[in-house]
């Protein structure tokens, strides 16, 4: 619920800009959409399942509405330059799935540095989705303290430019939790693209992490 409430607060900002949520798994994405529906803001929320992923993404990108797209596994190869997206949320540290036998075998061999390094690489890729050029701008928000823990564990593997941005982490001044200000009531846009699974400064200030925070 804490992550969903944070998303509602971001949606209540007066900018009316598109946002992207990196949910990391379909289970997290489904739960977030359920909570956002309960909060009454589902009219501004879009999502996808494994079958309509590309179509749902294309529809969101084409839309002029300030909708929020709840995504799964979209940390790489996604170009959201300019007004296509101005803010994004990382819900948790994207560690490899330990139920994968290959991952489990590596950890049995003590390859924990690989485990943390892989998650860090995914975070770095995700941070580059909304800032695509020196003159572009966007904000990345960290919604869970597991990301801060990852930064501590993988510090030695950080590129210098990323480490500088991590050192500049700060907590943003967000509006109070008020679904009414966030818009997206069901009457505004009845369950638009809301799938349920099974059915369907030219300087450091413009860096992807120039407005990042951790809520521990």
Where are these regions (language model features)?
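ASCE RecA-like P-loop NTPase motor cores
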Residues: 1-216
């Amino acid at each position: 619920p804490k992550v969903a409430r944070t998303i509602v607060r971001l949606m209540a900002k007066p900018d009316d800009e598109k946002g992207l949520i990196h949910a990391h798994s379909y289970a997290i994405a489904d739960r977030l959409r359920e909570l956002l529906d309960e909060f009454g803001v589902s009219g501004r929320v879009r999502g996808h399942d494994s079958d309509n992923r590309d179509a749902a993404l294309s529809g969101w990108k084409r839309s002029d509405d300030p909708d929020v797209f709840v995504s799964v596994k979209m940390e790489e190869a996604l170009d959201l330059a300019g007004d296509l997206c101005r803010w994004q949320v990382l819900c948790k540290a994207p560690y490899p799935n330990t139920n994968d036998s290959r991952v489990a075998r590596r950890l049995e061999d003590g390859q924990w540095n690989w485990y943390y390094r892989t998650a860090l690489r995914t975070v770095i890729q995700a941070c580059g989705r909304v800032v695509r050029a020196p003159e572009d701008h966007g904000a990345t928000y960290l919604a869970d303290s597991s990301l801060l823990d990852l930064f501590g564990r993988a510090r030695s593997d950080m590129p210098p430019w990323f480490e500088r941005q991590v050192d500049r982490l700060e907590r943003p001044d967000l509006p109070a939790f008020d679904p009414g200000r966030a818009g997206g009531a069901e009457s505004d846009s009845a369950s638009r693209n809301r799938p349920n699974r099974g059915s369907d400064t030219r300087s450091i200030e413009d860096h992807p992490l120039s407005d990042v925070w951790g809520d521990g």
